[in-house]
Amino acid sequence: MSQESNDDSLGIDKLSVDYDYLLYKIADYVSSIEFQTNQICKRQNELITKDIVNGIVDENIKHFREILTKCEKLENYFDMLDQINMITENFKTRLAQVARDYKELQKP
């Protein structure tokens, strides 16, 4: 077994990369939601100031529903983070037990 495969036999590097990617996706979603919300609000303000309101309410509701869908996806990502936290806590506990068992095996 090479040193490299031995160093990451538990897949910690992959978990770390997956975790970083999940955080990136969350940040990207937040930025996207923020941008879309600002755009809709600016557009709504323009429409109100120009008295062009006919038919716009339904379109705005559609856009806000799209944002709500993105918020739900964002909530799912946060749920994934919670699951990762539970997995890592469980992993730490199991790893500590393995270390204790190993020490017991080393006793004469």
UniProtKB/Swiss-Prot annotation:
GO terms for cellular component: BLOC-1 complex; cytoplasm. InterPro entries: CNL1 (IPR034455). Keywords: Cytoplasm, Transport. The keyword GTP-binding does not apply. It is found in: Cytoplasm. One of its GO terms (biological process) is endosome organization. It comes from the Eukaryota. Component of the biogenesis of lysosome-related organelles complex-1 (BLOC-1). Belongs to the BLOC1S4 family. Component of the biogenesis of lysosome-related organelles complex-1 (BLOC-1), a complex that is involved in endosomal cargo sorting. This is Biogenesis of lysosome-related organelles complex 1 subunit CNL1. It comes from Zygosaccharomyces rouxii (strain ATCC 2623 / CBS 732 / NBRC 1130 / NCYC 568 / NRRL Y-229).
